[in-house]
A protein has these predicted regions:
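Active-site catalytic microenvironments in core metabolic enzymes, especially phosphate/sugar-handling
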Residues: 1-90
């Protein structure tokens, strides 16, 4: 799982070194990670790609961070404001 924007080089490095069946990422440039995965599958490698979206992939971590941070900042209210999915699907 590589949430947010790790970049194509990190995605591909993880795919090569870890050899996952499924690489779950936050976002990708269409000319990097998706092309690598397509080429890998054409070469017979057993790997798939799931792109969650940048903000959606980071949302759980941001909610956790607000809970973790609150006790560290006594006297200051810490609030996580959910960004939700920025896209509407028809």
């Amino acid at each position: 799982l590589l949430p947010g924007a790790w970049g194509g080089l990190n995605h591909i490095k993880t795919a090569v070194e870890e050899k996952p069946d499924l690489l779950i990422i936050g976002e990708a440039n269409e000319w990097e990670t998706p092309e690598y995965i397509r080429d890998a599958r054409l070469l017979g490698m057993n790997i798939s790609l799931l792109i969650l979206g940048h903000s959606v992939s980071e949302e759980p971590g941001m909610a956790w961070m607000a809970e973790w941070l609150q006790p560290q900042l006594t006297g200051i209210k810490v609030t996580h404001v959910s960004s939700d999915d920025p896209f509407t699907w028809l």
